[in-house]
Design a protein with these regions (language model features):
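Formylglycine-dependent sulfatase
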Residues: 2-9, 16, 20, 24-475, ...
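A contiguous, mid-protein "functional segment" used to position or interact
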Residues: 500-539
Length: 570
């Protein structure tokens, strides 16, 4: 360049520098484009929402009470047909979702215990990976949430009307309906944080449709004119299942007439019949209670005029239960629609994983039951819908044996974070993204329920479920095995344990059960028995809690324990 005039040398140097800048900048832009955008996660969870009450699952009940907004997630994403919980009760299921570990390892086996918030959890791992985290609604693990940037939680179970919330240690009563309040909390947080460069985890967790199924004021008469079909097993005798015979969660025997069925003491009265927990109604404002009474008084007066007895009374109770339960679901579906609409209207759908699930299954009259707890299908199965347009094909169905144990590993993999070795679940990402068949995902699931003696007096039990068979052992104050062929007996009414036609299958199931207990590090400590006096005392306490209702029921001895009437109870 010595012979080139200085003017030209400067021009050439400028051109070379410009080309170098363009090249470097282009390479930087290409690198930025190659870095995948990590998805947001909107996790919506209800409490006790049965698959039978989600119309995407096609149950006859849901056809009469559809959930069009929840169904949008299934239509635009994946529906899980064989997703199960590890322990069918509120708090323990939530602990499993947070930790990816079975109850005996995360330390939260039963409602009423205190969750060890210091242990590693999904929100903590996501925060470490650069996510914002927020939780609104039902926590039910006692203590304050850890790992969340923002949170505002219901006190304990929460109340439907004018619920109390805890935020940063302060308790505040908020006027309104719990489902609407929690939905709006989630939406408000979205509006403030959706524009952030950081991805986020937002957990919107509802009380509904948990007992005692109080619909929003706008839905009090929603299904009054609808006659819902009761299950074929509504009046089953529970032959071959001692645990089913001794439970306290039969609709027509064990529901409280005031608290659960909202019945008045007599025609023309607005005073409730037996209602051991008055706070659910006492906290309503005068205006709310007036609208409530105007809706229920005509229905209750008609009931008193009918003077129903026996089977007709039992069927009426089933109808009232379903009408209230499904009307309570309606506000949840509306709330889901609001969140989906916001995400869509603000261009957030493509990069957001949307999850709809519940903490476990629930009985809607099957075997005559309400509530959950048992390892039978209605209680064991957890509805699960996941949408992520960027990666999950619309309208797919997943038939692998999955569990709430798998939620945390799945979200971590989608977020590009490492899945900790201590998590016992497996990522479901391949099932979702590549529509994998799931045959090799898991050949059996393990289940263990501990909460006895407690509400509804469902015995402690553990078991294994494969694609076709189920083996369960009820223990503590009884010792009974149950086994079912789900292909031949999907309603689980014929206990085939020790049936000679199934000897080989039974042996294989025992081997599988032993193997899973070894795999999941289950020790003898998990099978300790409750002192008999504690069990008897619990039966006595629940007899007292039932109060006047007890004296109206036949079969009192069967209900309150092992063929013996508890002491001091007449």
């Amino acid at each position: 360049m010595k012979n080139i005039p200085e003017l030209y040398r400067n021009q050439i140097l400028f051109l070379l520098l410009s080309l170098l800048y363009i090249s470097c900048n282009g390479e930087k832009e290409q690198q930025e484009q190659e870095v995948p955008k990590r998805p947001n996660i909107v996790f919506i969870m209800t409490d006790d929402h049965a698959a039978q009450a989600i119309s995407a699952y096609g149950h006859p009940l849901s056809k009469l009470a559809p959930t069009p907004n929840i169904d949008r997630i299934a239509q635009n994403g994946a529906k899980f047909n064989t997703n199960f919980c590890t322990n069918s009760i509120c708090g323990p299921s939530r602990a499993v979702i947070l930790t990816g570990k079975h109850s005996h390892l995360n330390g939260f086996r039963m409602n009423g215990e205190v969750f060890d918030g210091s242990q590693p959890t999904l929100p903590k791992y996501l925060k470490k990976a650069g996510y914002k985290t927020a939780l609104f609604g039902k926590w039910h693990l006692h203590g304050q949430p850890e790992g969340f940037d923002d949170w505002n939680i219901l006190v304990d179970q929460g109340n439907y009307y004018n619920p109390d919330f805890i935020k940063q240690g302060d308790t505040t009563r908020i006027e309104g309906y719990a489902t609407d309040i929690v939905t709006e909390m989630g939406l408000d947080w979205l509006k403030k944080n959706a524009g952030s460069e950081e991805p986020f985890l937002l957990m919107v967790q509802h009380k509904a449709p948990h007992r005692n199924w109080m619909p929003a004021l706008r839905h009090l008469n929603l299904y009054d004119s609808v006659h819902f079909p009761l299950p074929e097993t509504y009046f089953i005798e529970h032959e071959g299942s001692l645990a089913s015979q001794e439970q306290l969660q039969t609709i027509y025997d064990d529901m409280y007439e005031g608290h659960d069925l909202k019945l008045s003491v007599r025609k023309g009265s607005d005073s409730l019949a037996h209602n051991p927990w008055t706070s659910d109604f006492d906290r309503m404002t005068a205006g709310q209670r007036r609208i409530w009474n105007e809706a229920y008084r005509p229905k209750n007066d008609a009931f008193h005029e009918a003077n129903l007895k026996g089977r007709e009374l039992a069927e009426w109770k089933g109808q009232r239960y379903l009408q209230d339960y499904l009307a309570t679901v309606a506000s949840v579906d509306e709330g889901v629609g609001k969140i989906l609409d916001y995400l869509e209207e603000n261009g957030l759908m493509e990069y957001t994983i949307i999850v709809y699930t519940t903490d476990q299954g629930f009985y809607l009259g099957e075997k005559g039951f309400f509530d959950k707890r048992f390892m039978y299908e209605e209680s064991l199965a957890m509805p699960l819908l996941i949408q992520y347009p960027k990666e999950i094909p619309a309208g797919i169905e997943v038939n692998a044996l999955t569990q709430n144990l798998d939620f945390a590993p799945t979200f971590l993999e989608f977020a590009g974070a490492e899945i900790p070795a201590e998590m016992q679940g497996k990522s479901m990402r391949d099932l979702l993204v590549n529509a994998a068949s799931g045959k090799d995902f898991r050949n059996a699931i393990y289940y263990h329920y501990y909460d006895f003696p407690a509400f509804h007096m469902v015995k402690r039990h553990y078991g294994v479920r494969t694609a076709r068979y189920k083996l369960m052992h009820f223990y503590d104050d009884i010792d009974q095995w149950e086994m079912y062929d789900l292909q031949e007996d999907p309603r689980e009414i014929r206990n085939i344990y020790n049936n000679p036609n199934y000897t080989q299958v039974q042996q294989q199931l025992h081997t599988t059960l032993d193997s899973l207990q070894d795999q999941y590090k289950v020790t003898k400590k998990e099978f300790e028995q409750t002192p008999p006096e504690k069990v008897e005392r619990a039966y006595q306490n629940f007899a007292r809690l039932a109060d006047d209702d007890v004296r109206n029921y036949e079969g009192y001895v069967r209900k309150y324990g092992s063929g013996k009437v508890p002491k001091n109870v007449e």
